[in-house]
Amino acid sequence: MGAPASEREISFPCGEETLAGLLSMPKGAKAIVVFAHGSGSNHRSARNAEVARMLFDAGFASMRADLLTPDEAELNERTGQFQFDVATLAERVLAASTFVGTLEEAQLLPLAYFGASTGAAAVLTAAVKRRDVYAVVSRGGRPDLAIKILPEVKAATLFIVGGEDVPIIPLTEESYAALTCEKELAVVPDATHLFEEPGALEMVGRLTIDWLTRFLPKGQG
């Protein structure tokens, strides 16, 4: 399916840098979800685009934000410099969140995060610094990269992991045990790390929508 009609390219500042993103805003949105992509990906990620489309259809706005500039992304591809730089990635998530708060159509909406791969560590770190984040979802994430701060996370947190993502499952379980907030660990049967199997991303979308709806602040939706 194509992109929602109200999807538009945006740019937002972070310190001296300017980053790119895509904003999808359904009419009467219930909340806005800031997406953080894994290293080697960007706001055009097909997998996150599919989840964002499902969120749009369910009444959730989204901002799929690049966490690296084009030059940084190129450098990272060659050297891996930013791949596990969770502090920098979290700073970019916070910048995207601040930008969303300046948009007239989004500034009053509850805020949630969705992180994939290393982006999961970034959104969890950002959620500790922004107490107004009401929910966090990790898809095939690396929350273990932020394990020291996980006990401080207050937002309701959902970890989604593929049942065949063998290297990631124990890391996810260890991270899950460190959380003290409202939490859930969902396993998508037969799915590998990228959730490329038939029906896997659809299940990710359903789980995400259910979680965001369940913890939506009262008076919304």
Predicted regions and their residues:
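Catalytic histidine neighborhood in serine/cysteine hydrolases
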Residues: 179-194
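Short beta-strand/loop motif that positions the catalytic acidic residue
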Residues: 153, 159-161
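A conserved short beta-strand
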Residues: 132-143
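Catalytic active-site module of serine/aspartate enzymes centered on a nucleophile-bearing elbow/loop
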Residues: 199-221
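Serine-hydrolase catalytic machinery in alpha/beta-hydrolase-like enzymes
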Residues: 9-106, 194-199, 203
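Conserved alpha/beta-hydrolase "acid-adjacent" motif
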Residues: 166-171
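Active-site loop->helix "elbow" adjoining a glycine-rich segment at hydrolase catalytic centers
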Residues: 116-120, 141, 164
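Alpha/beta-hydrolase fold nucleophile elbow
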Residues: 105-117
